[in-house]
Amino acid sequence: MSGWPRIYYKLLNLPLSILVKSKSIPAEPAQELGLDTSRPIMYVLPYNSKADLLTLRAQCLAHDLPDPLEPLEIDGALLPRYVFIHGGPRVFTYYTPKEESVKLFHDYLDLHRSNPALDVQMVPVSVMFGRAPGREKGEENPPLRMLNGVQKFFAISWLGRDSFVRFSPSVSLRRMADEHGTDKIIAQKLARVARMHFARQRLAAVGPRLPARQDLFNKLLASKAIARAVEDEARSKKISHEKAQQNAIALMEEIAANFSYEMIRLTDRILGFTWNRLYQGINVHNAERVRQLAHDGHEIVYVPCHRSHMDYLLLSYVLYHQGLVPPHIAAGINLNFWPAGPIFRRLGAFFIRRTFKGNKLYSTVFREYLGELFSRGYSVEYFVEGGRSRTGRLLDPKTGTLSMTIQAMLRGGTRPITLVPIYIGYEHVMEVGTYAKELRGATKEKESLPQMLKGLSKLRNLGQGYVNFGEPMPLMTYLNQHVPEWRESIDPIEAIRPAWLTPTVNSIAADLMVRINNAGAANAMNLCCTALLASRQRSLTREQLTEQLDCYLDLMRNVPYSTDSTVPAASAGELIAHALQMNKFEVEKDTIGDIIILPREQAVLMTYYRNNIAHMLIMPSLMAAIITQHRRISRDALQQHVEALYPMLKAELFLRWEREELASVIDALASEMQRQGLITLQDDELHINPTHSRTLQLLAAGARETLQRYAITFWLLSANPSINRSTLEKESRTVAQRLSVLHGINAPEFFDKAVFSSLVLTLRDEGYISDTGDAEPAETMKIYQMLADLITSDVRLTIESATQGE
């Protein structure tokens, strides 16, 4: 590039460098999209805009990609490195330039015909300034239409700092030439496909237009389901039809979001400023799968785990910065207080009551509203656990909203709905102190402005945040496989509840929980907490802690929990240094070295972080516990132990493996433990390696409390085979509370009601007890004896004496 064009671009770049602060999506385009910078790269933009081109250039130079303004020289021919698909509008509309894209595509394809070694990577790129979707019945053109020069100037002036450059996966022109030829018709087809690609990408980033709120309410009121519910309300409560209709409108006002792009922009500024000061980084993994789903036109339902009130903001912020539309979020009605409620509502929150029971009008209005969101194409987010986890483990799923999602599909006419499980992890959860109090019996504080301000005032260094997108679940594919006849239940008017709905929803919910856990994120805090809580004195020397973290990291890297889970790339020493900055641990120095201590008052709180990754380490921990207690054990006996206990662990921690996969998992973990020197293999028997017995014991401690809990329930069941389920749950909790006091167990979930409830249900499903409450004494005693061998004698005595003393 020389002469006048260079001067022109330099002059144009001056205001752009001041006004525009764009973001690249993905963050590292070459690495994440697999671009080969040693091969020629050309860029395709949707329409002629020099401002877009220079914005793209700034991102290319920042990410070591070829400069789009530098032409490509191929076989002596100089070709522009960028192509505009459409000439774009002009200030003077009577002048319409000839579109050059087809000619340029043809020139590039022609070069591939004459040069078999050539392979140009064609990279589609969208540059967007602002993402307002606009309102229905608004302007004729969408807000992100092609702009002429004057319009573009105002758009950049106002929205230059809310812009992003979206790189799409490259297309190989060599493959195009080989498979489809190089004539002009193929070039025209290529330009047409590129136009469709950009239109889809724009919809994925901006979303459908927003309805006027009153128009939405009028449409809902006119629906047959709500009209019938209003009539029922008037009849059952003996009120006028108008009054019943007003009740329905009041419920719509209570439920419906009031999405505002300007509020999204403002909040993005505030959150960007806040995150940079509170978090040392937000780590996002597998976002490309979601971008692809949005691009392919899927109706996306985000299903994250629920750790904190921060989840709402963090996930919307992450999605916005991944070039996706922030979803409409189902939020608990407890958050609908001033000023949080109105703000959340403008950020896309719609509010849901804890229970729908006894209020047919409410359930109908909510179901119709959710169905309307799906039919209009808005992405939706809800927390399938129904509330925040107080223990750090996943809660049993609440299936009401999921059931309504499938019922929306049974109305017909919606785009394919895909559920996207999401694991959210933190190194610091601001509510963790409150959770510990609630688990001890304190009444939950009602959310309010003073409580919110109190929480915000305590925010300090929050370390790293993690958002891992799990394996998506296309609902249509799932139903086709598991309920082939589901289409027979489609009814565009009535909310259908076919016989297959409840078991299918339960199965989908359980699968979602497994997929959320599959995307788990290990981090410095949860690894250090796991190691220190495994030590009976909650303290380890720096060397011991480093060795233990190395053990965990090697297990997770060499035998990954799943392909979606993430493990820090940092070394054990670096992770410890980072964790110490969080001010949760104390360091005592003596003449020999450092001792890292988890203070007693912090220990209960830190179990929360340990529990976040308990599922990722429970299998090696269980194996270590069995080997440690037996000193030596054959592979077959080890497998029998694991298989006997696995159904309880799978149900409690939403583990991913089926029973038939256990043998290969055990073999892989045993090989890794042998490689680390934790165990030795002699005559097909696994033996403790005395030189690494401490590391193995600390690894085994991860399963210690779980095994003690199971021992309690199996002992009670063996001692009283006719005990009913509710009494078994209650007595198990009582013994667990006693055990925690006598043996200093600092884990609130140790006697959590939900944990024992889940365990007793699993025992019923596995046939240890029947619905009438009769246990099979021989079987339960056999499992108890197995568990008794895996716990210490003093704990065993406490358990057995608890029932003998009654």
Swiss-Prot record:
Molecular function as annotated in GO: glycerol-3-phosphate O-acyltransferase activity
Task: Name the domain of life.
Answer: Bacteria
Where's it mainly located? membrane
Record's keyword terms, sorted:
Acyltransferase, Cell inner membrane, Cell membrane, Lipid biosynthesis, Lipid metabolism, Membrane, Phospholipid biosynthesis, Phospholipid metabolism, Transferase
**Does Plastid count among this protein's keywords?**
no
Its record classes its membrane topology as: Peripheral membrane protein
Localization recorded for this chain is:
Cell inner membrane
Q: Can you name a GO cellular component term?
A: plasma membrane
User: Which pathway is this protein engaged in?
Assistant: Phospholipid metabolism; CDP-diacylglycerol biosynthesis; CDP-diacylglycerol from sn-glycerol 3-phosphate: step 1/3
Q: What class of enzyme is it?
A: transferase
Pfam families recorded: Acyltransferase (PF01553), GPAT_C (PF19277)
Give EC number(s), comma-separated: 2.3.1.15
Q: Show the InterPro entries listed in the entry.
A: GPAT/DHAPAT (IPR022284), GPAT/DHAPAT_C (IPR045520), GPAT/DHAPAT_LPLAT (IPR041728), GPAT_PlsB (IPR028354), Plipid/glycerol_acylTrfase (IPR002123)
As its record notes, the protein acts as a catalyst of:
sn-glycerol 3-phosphate + an acyl-CoA = a 1-acyl-sn-glycero-3-phosphate + CoA
Q: Where is this motif: HXXXXD motif?
A: 305-310
**Biological-process GO terms, alphabetical:** CDP-diacylglycerol biosynthetic process; fatty acid metabolic process
Family, as annotated: Belongs to the GPAT/DAPAT family.
**Domains as described in the record:** The HXXXXD motif is essential for acyltransferase activity and may constitute the binding site for the phosphate moiety of the glycerol-3-phosphate.
Put simply, this protein is called: Glycerol-3-phosphate acyltransferase
Organism annotation? Salmonella paratyphi A (strain AKU_12601)
Q: What is the lineage of its organism?
A: Bacteria, Pseudomonadati, Pseudomonadota, Gammaproteobacteria, Enterobacterales
> Which gene does this sequence derive from?
plsB
